[in-house]
């Protein structure tokens, strides 16, 4: 079994960490953040309260930004290789363009 590693999520003002297993935690207290699943798409997300507003953030973007950061990632999609949007393990995710993401779906009959 691959060891779970934690890295800071670079695009949040809060000190949050994402694991290679697709978990999110508070980097100070080390307590896990509650993760929800969108009923319409199956994507996993969490909510934070920043500047008196609720901000929703997708787990797959956090995992990739924390463990596989690249320049310009804000403009890229994250592809779930196995088509399971709730599988946010780093081994199942890859950066891609919107076009590449669509081609991946078409090639695999999705």
Where are these regions (language model features)?
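Conserved recognition-core residues within compact binding domains
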Residues: 1-77, 82-110
């Amino acid at each position: 079994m691959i060891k779970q590693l934690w890295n800071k999520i670079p695009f949040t003002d809060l000190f949050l960490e994402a694991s290679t297993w697709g978990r999110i935690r508070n980097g100070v207290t080390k307590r896990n953040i509650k993760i929800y699943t969108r009923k319409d798409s199956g994507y996993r997300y969490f909510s934070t309260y920043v500047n008196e507003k609720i901000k929703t953030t997708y787990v797959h973007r956090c995992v990739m930004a924390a463990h596989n950061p690249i320049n310009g990632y804000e403009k890229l999609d994250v592809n779930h290789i196995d088509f399971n949007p709730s599988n946010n393990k780093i081994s199942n995710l890859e950066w891609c363009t919107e076009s590449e993401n669509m081609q991946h779906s078409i090639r695999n009959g999705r």
